[in-house]
Design a protein with these regions (language model features):
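Histidine-centered beta-alpha loop that forms part of the nucleotide-sugar donor binding/catalytic region
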Residues: 27, 72, 110
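Short glycine/serine/threonine-biased micro-segments
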Residues: 32, 61, 65, 69-70, ...
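Conserved CoA-thioester-binding segment of acyl-CoA-metabolizing enzymes
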Residues: 2-64
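Residue-level recognition of alpha-helix initiation/capping sites
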Residues: 41, 89-90, 112
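Glycine- (often His-adjacent) and acidic-residue-rich active-site loop
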Residues: 55, 63-97
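Glycine-rich beta-to-alpha active-site loop
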Residues: 97-112
Length: 112
C-alpha cells in the first residue's frame, strides 16, 4: 500500500492506492464536493498519476461524506456574466484530458 505521504499532496481530493486500485475521493464536503476549477485540476493530475503508475490497474472516484458531487461550483462563476462563462470554457481542457485515460475508471456514487 502506498501511504498518502508518498503520493502528491492535494487540497481538494484524497488519493489512496491499495491492491492495484487508486481511490480518488473528492473532498470538499462543505460544498457537497462541487466541482471547482481547483478540484478538477487536481482530479486530472491524480488520474494521470494513476495512469502512469504501473502498480495501478483501476481507478475509483468517490465523494466524501454525503455527496458524490453536486455539479459545477457556481460560486466561481458568480462575478462573471454569461458570455464570460461561456467563452472561458472552464471544463473542456480537463474533460479532454480525462477522456485520454486508458485505465478503467469507476464512479462509486452514493448520496447526491
Amino acid at each position: 500500500m502506498l501511504r498518502r505521504a508518498e503520493l502528491m499532496a492535494y487540497e481538494t481530493i484524497i488519493v489512496d492506492i491499495e491492491d492495484h486500485v487508486c481511490v480518488i475521493t473528492l473532498n470538499r464536503p462543505e460544498a457537497l464536493n462541487a466541482l471547482s476549477k481547483e478540484l478538477l485540476d487536481e482530479l486530472v493530475e491524480a488520474l494521470e498519476e494513476g495512469q502512469n503508475n504501473d502498480k495501478v490497474r483501476c481507478i475509483v472516484i468517490t465523494g466524501s461524506e454525503k455527496a458524490f458531487a453536486a455539479g459545477a461550483d457556481i460560486k466561481m462563476m458568480q462575478d462573471k456574466n454569461f458570455s464570460e462563462v461561456f467563452l472561458e470554457d472552464l471544463f473542456t481542457n480537463q474533460a479532454d484530458r480525462i477522456s485520454r485515460i486508458r485505465k478503467p475508471i469507476i464512479a462509486a456514487v452514493s448520496g447526491y
